[in-house]
């Protein structure tokens, strides 16, 4: 467990405060998890963003009438801190009985509070339900590898040694799997996700990638660090010209977390998948 997470509200009984309380936000430094991967803030081999989508965003108009919307938050992958998920939920719940004169006032408040917690500017979009309905459900790009026949004997830790590639062939492709699962390092609750890998480099053996993804099944770590580990393991193996790893996790507590890591300029579709 991350030392800072021990002091967070995650996994503990919490009072649900219904009026605006920004102090509920609990930042967790990324540095310790970066260090586990041999990284520092100065040596990150990727660009990226963590998309958080909130499906339980509600506040009051000055008249007292409630409003509901979908909140989309983009936290830079290089920010000093992640925001612990339960504290994020408690903070958003504290808006429920708080009046805002305009949507713009709410957006500015969210931007200021979340940016202060993350240590970098956080993007905020407040979207109507009609807008989200019109978008529909997205599908991941490329080939789904989930029907490949593999044998699995261990789930306790990520196993990069399972990965293999054909160095004699250079390919550009996108592949994805819906079999990503890891566990919350604080509560041990399951985190279900889908992951897409896009790259140009030595031809990756698809069955080995699927076995590697499944090896995360009993691994305990935060969503962001799981994606960074996958990115680094593939980068070491493939030595690719380009590499992107993007995971979209199933929501819990009204929030889903979607980490994106890439060697390329950010170009991300934040539309929800079928399980989200």
UniProtKB/Swiss-Prot annotation:
It is found in: Cytoplasm. It is an enzyme of class 1 (oxidoreductase). Keywords: Cytoplasm, NADP, Oxidoreductase, Queuosine biosynthesis. Pathway: tRNA modification; tRNA-queuosine biosynthesis. The keyword Transferase does not apply. One of its GO terms (cellular component) is cytoplasm. NADPH binds at residues 85-86, 252-253. GO terms for biological process: queuosine biosynthetic process; tRNA modification. It holds the Pfam family QueF. Its EC number is 1.7.1.13. GO terms for molecular function: preQ1 synthase activity. The active site is at 184 (thioimide intermediate), 191 (proton donor). It comes from the Bacteria. It catalyses: 7-aminomethyl-7-carbaguanine + 2 NADP(+) = 7-cyano-7-deazaguanine + 2 NADPH + 3 H(+). Substrate binds at residues 83-85, 223-224. Homodimer. Catalyzes the NADPH-dependent reduction of 7-cyano-7-deazaguanine (preQ0) to 7-aminomethyl-7-deazaguanine (preQ1). NCBIfam families: QueF. Belongs to the GTP cyclohydrolase I family. QueF type 2 subfamily. This is NADPH-dependent 7-cyano-7-deazaguanine reductase. It comes from Pseudomonas syringae pv. syringae (strain B728a). The lineage of its organism: Bacteria, Pseudomonadati, Pseudomonadota, Gammaproteobacteria, Pseudomonadales.
């Amino acid at each position: 467990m991350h030392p800072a997470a021990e002091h967070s509200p995650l996994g503990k009984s919490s009072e649900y405060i219904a009026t605006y309380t920004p102090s509920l936000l609990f930042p967790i430094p990324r540095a310790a998890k970066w260090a586990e991967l041999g990284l520092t803030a100065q040596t990150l081999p990727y660009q990226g963003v963590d998309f958080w989508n909130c499906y339980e965003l509600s506040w009051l108009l000055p008249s007292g009438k409630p409003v509901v919307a979908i909140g989309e938050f983009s936290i830079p992958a290089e920010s000093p801190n992640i925001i612990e998920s339960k504290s994020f939920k408690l903070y958003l719940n504290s808006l429920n009985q708080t009046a805002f004169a305009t949507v713009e006032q709410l957006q500015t408040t969210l931007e200021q509070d979340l940016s202060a917690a993350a240590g970098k500017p956080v993007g905020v979009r407040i979207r109507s339900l009609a807008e989200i309905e019109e978008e529909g459900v997205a599908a991941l790009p490329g080939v789904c590898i989930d029907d490949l026949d593999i044998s699995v004997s261990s789930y306790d830790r990520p196993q990069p040694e399972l990965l293999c590639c054909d160095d004699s062939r250079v390919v550009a492709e996108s592949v994805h799997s819906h079999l990503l699962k890891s566990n919350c390092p604080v509560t041990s609750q399951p985190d279900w996700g889908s992951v897409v890998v896009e790259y140009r480099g030595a031809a990756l053996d698809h069955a080995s990638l699927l076995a590697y993804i499944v090896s995360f099944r009993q691994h305990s770590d935060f969503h962001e660090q799981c994606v960074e580990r996958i990115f680094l393991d593939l980068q070491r193996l493939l030595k690719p010209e380009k590499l992107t790893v993007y995971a979209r996790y199933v929501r819990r507590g009204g929030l889903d977390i979607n980490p994106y890591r890439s060697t390329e300029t950010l170009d991300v579709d934040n539309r929800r998948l079928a399980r989200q």
